[in-house]
């Protein structure tokens, strides 16, 4: 499997796990135990899948090259929080995201 594709799967699964945890907190506030358990279960599945694929990825890429790309999760989770959960994202957040994207592009030159 292509290393980039594997890395994208890791990023997607990790992000999905974080979003599932956030959704579980909404269900928890509403005292919807069944929904909370479903979201927590999905979170565990996504995060465990991401971890297993991460271990596979580390067989092919050095940690020093692969790990910085997990910063994409910070960007995706921030954007998802803003669009799906209506969380406020300040100008400082947007500037930070821009800086991270530049850093990821610079680091990506080595892969």
From Swiss-Prot:
GO terms classed as biological process: lipid A biosynthetic process; lipopolysaccharide biosynthetic process
Domain of life (superkingdom): Bacteria
Location in the cell: Cell inner membrane
Gene Ontology CC annotations of this record: plasma membrane
Parts of the chain that traverse the membrane: 37-57, 65-85, 91-111
GO molecular function, one term: carbohydrate derivative transmembrane transporter activity
Topology in membrane: Multi-pass membrane protein
Keywords carried by this UniProt record: Cell inner membrane, Cell membrane, Lipid A biosynthesis, Lipid biosynthesis, Lipid metabolism, Lipopolysaccharide biosynthesis, Membrane, Transmembrane, Transmembrane helix, Transport
Pathway assignment: Bacterial outer membrane biogenesis; lipopolysaccharide biosynthesis
Pfam families hit by this protein: EamA
Keyword Iron annotated: no
Keyword Transcription regulation: no
InterPro entries referenced in this protein's UniProt entry, alphabetically: EamA_dom, Flippase_ArnE, Small_drug/metabolite_transptr
Description of how the protein assembles with itself and partners: Heterodimer of ArnE and ArnF.
Similarity comment: Belongs to the ArnE family.
Function: Translocates 4-amino-4-deoxy-L-arabinose-phosphoundecaprenol (alpha-L-Ara4N-phosphoundecaprenol) from the cytoplasmic to the periplasmic side of the inner membrane.
Name listed for the protein in its UniProt record: Probable 4-amino-4-deoxy-L-arabinose-phosphoundecaprenol flippase subunit ArnE
